[in-house]
Design a protein with these regions (language model features):
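N-terminal amphipathic/basic leader segments beginning at the initiator methionine
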Residues: 1-21
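Alpha/beta enzyme core
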Residues: 13, 26-31, 37-327
Length: 327
């Protein structure tokens, strides 16, 4: 039998397989999510996220050093305040937990690139992502507090802001506020297509942000919808977003691919807490090879079109990339 085309030729040895890889990744594309809790001398494990911790601002340096040693130089900060109220006023407090954390990191590790999550759910006493009018989130009133929060983060030293609230018009509101205060070069990474997903459970435990009533389907996207994601991304581009994001990642690889193909902005994907927790639990139970599944799932997200990956596995993935196992 004569065969002139034999795909196996390019799979014959590891050196050759690495040379012809179609998807190339590096630690420069990784962002590590980090939880800051108000207080002092705190490092507490997060039961729902094996291997992850909440840090007070005075101890966050421990995790920053660990990230830098692993080759990860970008973090995404989430805050857990001591005080919560109806309007989430701790979110834009100049001495709030995120603002303290930003200053603490930048003072000691100016090379660390800091992205901050901009939302209200961790700061409101009702756990919803904005200002309530009855039992509904008032979209337009929420825009003002989101913009104030983003500005307070940038004034504290944040390099980039990432609004995750899913209010209509938030990118335009934040962009205008930052520009008006002279921060025209501060980029916005928008949670553009953020779905109302069941995969967020461990995060809500970690951040203490579960809604006190109802759910978030009135503002986060319906998992049934594909075209709506394109509309959300297009609106964010029009309003001035610099980076688009799809969240979650693994169950929405089709959305990552379509948005990546359709728009010329960098595409981020957030491999969320539920994805991480499932891999950790299955690995601990001996059902899967945790390391290989971690690498394979991350690779699938990049292959779908993501340029940036936000993941709790960032440090482990950076090592795999540096050793040539991935990318």
């Amino acid at each position: 039998m004569e065969m002139s085309i034999r795909p196996r030729r390019l799979r014959s040895c590891e050196n050759l397989r690495r040379m012809v890889r179609e998807t190339r990744v590096s630690p420069e594309s990784l962002i590590y999510p980090l939880f800051l809790i108000e207080g002092e001398n705190i490092k507490e494990p997060i039961p729902s996220l094996d291997g992850q911790y909440r840090y007070s601002p005075d101890r966050v340096w421990e995790e920053i050093e660990s990230c830098l040693a692993a080759g990860v130089s970008r973090v995404l900060l989430f805050g857990i305040p001591a005080h919560k109220d109806a309007c989430g006023s701790s979110a834009w407090d100049p001495n709030g937990v995120v603002q303290q954390g930003i200053r603490a990191i930048k003072e000691k590790y100016p090379q660390m690139y800091i992205v901050t999550d901009v939302c209200m759910c961790e700061y409101t006493d009702h756990g919803h992502c904005g200002i309530l009018c009855g039992h509904n989130v008032d979209n337009d009133k929420t825009l003002e507090v989101l913009a104030k929060t983003a500005l307070s983060h940038v004034e504290a030293g944040a390099d980039m802001v990432a609004p995750s609230d899913m209010m209509d018009g938030r990118i335009a509101a934040i962009r205008e506020t930052l520009d008006d205060h002279g921060y025209v070069n501060t980029p916005i990474m928008s949670y553009s297509a953020k779905y109302a997903s069941a995969f967020y459970g461990p995060f809500r435990d970690a951040a203490g942000s579960a809604p006190a009533f109802g759910d978030r389907r009135g503002y986060q996207m319906d998992p049934h919808n594909r075209k709506e994601a394109m509309k959300e991304c297009a609106l964010d581009v029009e309003e001035g977003a610099d980076i688009l994001m799809v969240k979650p990642a693994l169950s929405y690889l089709d959305i990552i691919r379509e948005c990546s193909d359709a728009f010329d902005l960098p595409m981020a994907a957030y491999s969320v807490s539920g994805e991480y927790a499932m891999i950790k639990a299955a690995g601990k139970a001996g059902l899967i090879d945790e390391h290989r599944v971690m690498c394979e799932s991350a690779l699938s997200i990049y292959r779908a079109g993501a340029n940036i990956l936000i993941t709790y596995f960032a440090k482990e993935l950076a090592k795999a990339m540096q050793e040539g196992e991935l990318g």
